[in-house]
UniProtKB/Swiss-Prot annotation:
The lineage of its organism: Bacteria, Pseudomonadati, Pseudomonadota, Gammaproteobacteria, Pasteurellales. One of its GO terms (molecular function) is DNA binding. Interacts with UvrB in an incision complex. GO terms for biological process: nucleotide-excision repair; SOS response. This is UvrABC system protein C.
Amino acid sequence: MSQFNAKAFLADVPHLPGVYRMYDANQAIIYVGKAKDLKKRLASYFRSQVASKKIEALVGNIHHIDTTITHSETEALLLEHNYIKQHQPKYNVLLRDDKSYPYLLLTKHQHPRLTAFRGSKKVAGEYFGPYPNVSAVRESLNLLQKIFPIRQCEDNYYKNRSRPCLQHQIGRCLAPCVTGYCSQQEYDNQVKWVRLFLQGKDSQVIDYLMQKMEIAASELDFETAARFRDQIQSVRAVQEKQFVANQRLDDLDIISIAYQSGLACAHILFIRQGKVLGNRAYFPKVPSHTDLTELADTFIGQFYLQLNQHRSIPNQIILDQPLTESNALAQLLTEQAGHKVTIITNHVRGDKSRYLALAQTNARAALSLQLKQSTTIHKRYDALKILLKLPTIKRMECFDISHTMGSQTVASCVVFDENGPLKSDYRRFNIEGITGGDDYAGMEQALVKRYDKPLPIEKIPDIIFIDGGKGQLNRALQVFEKLTVAWDKHKPLLIGVAKGAERKAGLETLIIGRLKKEIHLPIDSPALHLIQHIRDESHHHAISGHRKKRQKAFVESGLESIAGVGAKRRQALLKYLGGMQGVKSATLAEIESVPGISKTLAGVIFDTLHNS
């Protein structure tokens, strides 16, 4: 129980805006908050009548408090969310998803490039989005390339072409990289139509194309007219599939928050240029006894204010929960976005009301599904605890090895907590310096890389699964015996998961720890299902890493054997000629044009690739 002297502390706290950080006895930040008046806000935690069980638990763990005075409440709001992002305090609502949204980017070049983009908007050009996920933006990009044949290639590839690439041959690019294949006006028209299409002005695009088709037909240029006709049909087909909200609607995000049985879901509907671009559900980590207003405050702040996210902030944010600081938050978002941002939490009417109802339906459905999945995971955890006679299992890790005939070996480590896969903690390890195919040595190297270093208490697993039989488990046990670390290396229970006859799921044998006790579980065992889940995750993670490594080796292997072609020259060849296929199909003159490649070396490269 905390022995914090609140009275002595509060005596020196000023009546000013700022941020406060609460620490436990281990010097870990357990809560971050902001206040218009620090003294009043902090005093509220130490009243005789505690506001909630959450506050009671928080106050009971306070060892000391730090404060930072700010110029304004708005500045405090931004600083609060930066601290939450940095320290992930135990008693704050935490937004787990840490990825920025993808956009479509139309660059500012003589011949603009259309490409998918994620990250800081430092590249000059027009950004369209955000799209809810990478799949959505790739689908849109693929569709647009079929309708409007403008380039999508990297600048280095574009600048070094002497003949059109495959994209031109299949009708997906006008080949502006090579003189004589399309005029500047023709290319500019395609760019204009792409821009209008992405702005939601489909009808204008069709009108332009109709005019062009009629002019071509009147001039008896039926081939060109047919091309415009095909474009019109493609745009109309897209119109039929797209979910059009209302052309008069502003850019807006519509957010519904649902909360049940300790789980929360924030469902966001993205509307841009009158079109619903998509939706996305978030499941923030919520401390016990958190009320909906605090949940809404923290989620909205973290979602839009975490500076490394590069969020697209719309003109309006519509929310089905009240906010305690909606005016201050709107002011801060306006400053961040460079345009006026309004936050609406009541009196939503018309189309906006209907879309809010849609977001609410989706939030409830997503939360219901998450609760069912969570219940299943918890039941499986309980079954595993009973099987292994463990009082608690907070963290499990599983390792697997993947290679092709001993080459490009990769080890994977996946992590599960009580809520299932913790993908942000997944890791892969490149295994080097071992005899090809020696899985024992590969596993040893992976375990040393993972555990032979300082680990915080919360990162020490309760169970480590090794995908393999007694031999793999023995090697893992030897690794742990040799570890010289400050953390308790005897805490994790090591378990080998040996594949059954014919490697069929359900016939696995568990080999438990140092006693090597063998357990065969029935095929319908919830504990077995959990073990299969984490084992399969590790297997897939290892295979995907191995495939990437193998592909990279395949791309580079054709050049590695050529004398005089080191890493830098190899990289230049691949970069300027568009990958290994581009290098192999390049002419001698094209190879000579690559920076750093002499005429003599170009001849050697050309002869080697064409004679091999």
